[in-house]
Amino acid sequence: MGASLLLPLRRRPWTCRTCLLQARRSLETAASPATHRAAFDYLPSKNDAQKKSDDDTLRRVFDSQPFWREFSQRSAAHLKPTGLVQNQYLTSPDGFRVFATTTLQKCQAIVAKVLAGTTLEDYQSMARDLDRLSDLLCRVIDLSDFIRVIHPDPRVQEAATQAYALMFEYMNVLNTTTGLNDQLKKAAANPEVTARWSDEEKIVAQILIKDFSNSAIHMPPHARQRFVNLSNDISQLGNTFVNAAEPAKSHVTVSANSLRGLDPILVQQIKRWNRTASVPSMGLIPRLALRSVHDEGVRREVYLATRTSSARQIQRLEQLLAKRAELAQLSGYDSFAHMTLSDKMAKSPEAVSNFLTSLVGSNRPYVQEELAQLQSMKGSAGRLQPWDHAYYVHQRVLQYSQSRRSRELSAVPEFFSLGTVMQGLSRLFDRLYGVRLVPQETAAGETWNSDVRRLDVVDEADRHIAVIYCDLFSRPNKHPNPAHYTLRCAREISAEEVAECATTMDASAHPNDGMATAVDRDAKTLRQLPTIALVCDFPEPPATGTGRPSLLSEHSVRTLFHEMGHALHSILGQTRLQSISGTRCATDFAELPSVLMERFATAPEVLALYARHWETDAPLSESMMQHMEKDRTAHGSIYGAMENESQILMALVDQAYHSLPAGQATSIDSTAVFHQVSAEHCTLPDPTDTKPPTSWQGFFGHLHGYGATYYSYIFDRAIANKLWEDVFQQGKAAVDRQAGERYKNEVLRWGGGRNGWNCVAGVLGSAHPANADGRLVEGGDEAMREVGRWGLGRDGVSE
């Protein structure tokens, strides 16, 4: 499938891709649409009693199964059955077909309107019309994509898959509709039109024009067909590269006696009849062997095997790189990196390289400090080698755990029941941003599994502003990876859309398909509320209500805070147009809210809000908080900087591969490039004299999904560290409303409607030394270098 209109419009991060007839009168009177179940109306609490009750309920719905059963069954008597996530169509598998075809008809009407536009009024509405087209496409695609993965019923999975496919087929039609691009360009070039556009409309128009350009819609037919063919080849090659990664040799044969240090049970699993053992080159066993086998020669063999890809895997990668370079050349760019980065904060591969090399410099002293400690452990046995690193790191961690790690730390999870952590998130959001999480009963048919909890997000005036479905407990066949999904984006629903529903023959027609809406009383407009799903894989609490609830490790707590950071961006980034709402921002800015949220998870000021013993309700003691901090610092000092260097190296390799012009990319030697980058920037590089040479790049699956943008996570991490240090004062202002409002107003509320550099400069302030002479606002090479100088710090989290 070739490049398409939808994929850019969805603008989803790594991945991972947000009233009825009386509504029109509601807009005129600013009265609440009380006749509809789509959005719950909250009575103002007037005092703290309701808030306290909601807070207590939030903890209990996650920690007590009997309480949850009682809570979830209350709705049976007074709530009418509904569809999945309140979508009025999705009451049965066939509803996906009706949902998709009905939405398709709405899309076709918008396309016809745009193509027929001739008047000034027609062109003035064009940015908003195409934004609505994007919203309609994403309504089906995003929700169907999620349901086909998460729903336990195969019939629903199949129906969702078909709805998904139908909309993709329609996108192929849009890809050939050159008139959409032509009309939007006419509108954007007319000063009389743009003078009446809002800032959001101007931004969305430019985004869509760029997206059209990237999909080759402006090219002559033969070039466009070549573009589509290349896109198809890239997709297929990329998927194969990710899913068929393989080593040059499947295993390493060694003497079983030489595996001393490895768990004897594992040795028995791989032992052969002739006293040898076959160590696989992929999976958990080789990783454990590198950590624990005492024999350096064995570690060397295993290490080299795990770092050497098969020849056909390298061939796949090099074909992928060559086709991407050709695609960029066809589109008028010097390289794939130039094409990909043109609308990112970085703007160019040169700027990314400046950031990464600056980061190497700020990280290098910490790396040397860590390696010096490991070298002293190896002593006279020789110079530290790359296959030694995991082994001596493990030895240092064991030494630390045996000598200085506090026994109190083993009890820390008892203060992190899932309910208390969710309670803590709500309390933190209330302190910083004036919003909180309220457990809400669900109607029959609303959730895809009986253990899914619904939380409504309300503000200080008790106005409903978002919906979060929490699917946090493990179950058979559920994907274990934590994730955030935007099922419906925030946007303003126009009066015309409400009127359209009011005049339809279908009395149940709803401008948001029955999903959550709310009236903005100040603007007298109807809003489509963001609907979000959070998915994790935590153990379920006991059914009887006796015994421990689901207790989280520190790592799991940080993971939950990370995913909720994405949700927070969707909740507070409520723009008028959906193409720039919430997380729909530049790829290299999208991880900032989630990475920053991790810092709050274990800050003492935040722990004091929620960390309480699941049984006694005793708060986490100050001494335990101090031990947690010491433990993180100790682990970070053992391996944090080397982990940073590894991430930086991968980002540098990604840039080196994707910055090559088409002429050079067709004959690329990816292994030589990998070793060249390693020799220049890696403190402990792979040897270059092995035959065959190591070719770790064949296992770097993110080269497909994040081609030319792998730097994004560490870029956002550097920014997050700076904001934590200077805005939230290294945690001292972690629950300070003034700091929270500053961050919300300068970063979160904009979604993707403001240049990321303006957000960073705004939240740091014009007087900040890093923003001297407006260097951050301007972005570019110097701003990227400045962020590189901020560094990544060292952060180790014990399991």
From Swiss-Prot:
It is an enzyme of class 3 (hydrolase). The keyword NADP does not apply. InterPro entries: M3A_MIP (IPR033851), MetalloPept_cat_dom_sf (IPR024079), Neurolysin/TOP_dom2 (IPR024077), Pept_M3A_M3B (IPR045090), Pept_M3A_M3B_dom (IPR001567). Keywords: Hydrolase, Metal-binding, Metalloprotease, Mitochondrion, Protease, Transit peptide, Zinc. It holds the Pfam family Peptidase_M3. Zn(2+) binds at residues 562, 566, 569. It is found in: Mitochondrion matrix. Binds 1 zinc ion. Its main location: mitochondrion. Signal peptide: none annotated. GO terms for molecular function: metal ion binding; metalloendopeptidase activity. The keyword Protease applies. The active site is at 563. GO terms for cellular component: mitochondrial matrix. It catalyses: Release of an N-terminal octapeptide as second stage of processing of some proteins imported into the mitochondrion. Its EC number is 3.4.24.59. Its cofactor is Zn(2+). GO terms for biological process: peptide metabolic process; protein processing involved in protein targeting to mitochondrion. SUPFAM superfamilies: Metalloproteases ('zincins'), catalytic domain (SSF55486). It comes from the Eukaryota. Cleaves proteins, imported into the mitochondrion, to their mature size. While most mitochondrial precursor proteins are processed to the mature form in one step by mitochondrial processing peptidase (MPP), the sequential cleavage by MIP of an octapeptide after initial processing by MPP is a required step for a subgroup of nuclear-encoded precursor proteins destined for the matrix or the inner membrane. Belongs to the peptidase M3 family. PANTHER family: MITOCHONDRIAL INTERMEDIATE PEPTIDASE, PROTEASE M3 THIMET OLIGOPEPTIDASE-RELATED. This is Mitochondrial intermediate peptidase.
